[in-house]
């Protein structure tokens, strides 16, 4: 899951966020309900290389409400300025080229058109998204810095790292959910297996020899691989990267054997024949690749994972 957040500081829990509460976007860490009201989700369609933002207008309405609220922040000069009066940044906690980056750039294009200001994408990769999260959390809560968070940065990392550099609940206010994305198990075509059963047999005959890349420790593709290890009773070796793009580059060069990655990041390479699609991690097949089986139906019953 990818979602759009804005930094939230204790001193700024009134003002720009008052209107957000009225629209149902919650302020975590306050006495208000911490449950986000349902928003329309993005439908990501890669076959035409376009994203149909079905929830775009609702997301923009939330951002517009944020803009309206900025007028009551302390400071007469700031109160008189129309929002947005300068470019807006979207911090992406992974390198350019991955799904989180793709989504941020698509959202940024729409925001720039609707709000009349440039939207700049800042890629701050590393530590499973924690570097970008810390960077965004320290930004001013003035509506000019947004954060494209993921299930990893806002949930999983808190269980994996002894000390988080930011509080994923108290330091951010959620604006809208952006997308749910399936993961795809892909292999370099030079690998000797083409199906899940063949890969399992090869992995059991060669423990630790199959290495799999991921966008970083704790990212959902990493956990997809570890879940496969546990359920298939094999030993795949994890190699973390600072984002999806460098991992895919090494996969294309056969420096790593396989990868569990978000569908949008790898499907162009599957369609060009540069990567081999083995299985999809969700419970149902993807309409984008209807001939590619799920991992569950291909030999690991009960397996299901997504980003």
Residue ranges and their predicted role:
Residues 194, 266-307:
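C-terminal lobe and pocket-closing loops
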Residues 73-79:
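Sec/Tat signal peptide C-region and signal peptidase I cleavage site
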Residues 138-143, 151, 159-246, 295-307:
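Hinge/capping helix and adjacent helix->loop/strand transition within the periplasmic-binding protein
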Residues 150-151, 189, 263-264, 282-283:
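Short secondary-structure boundary segments
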Residues 79-170, 209-211, 217, 233-262, ...:
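N-terminal (or domain-start) structured segment
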Residues 3-12, 16-54, 61-72:
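N-terminal secretory signal peptides
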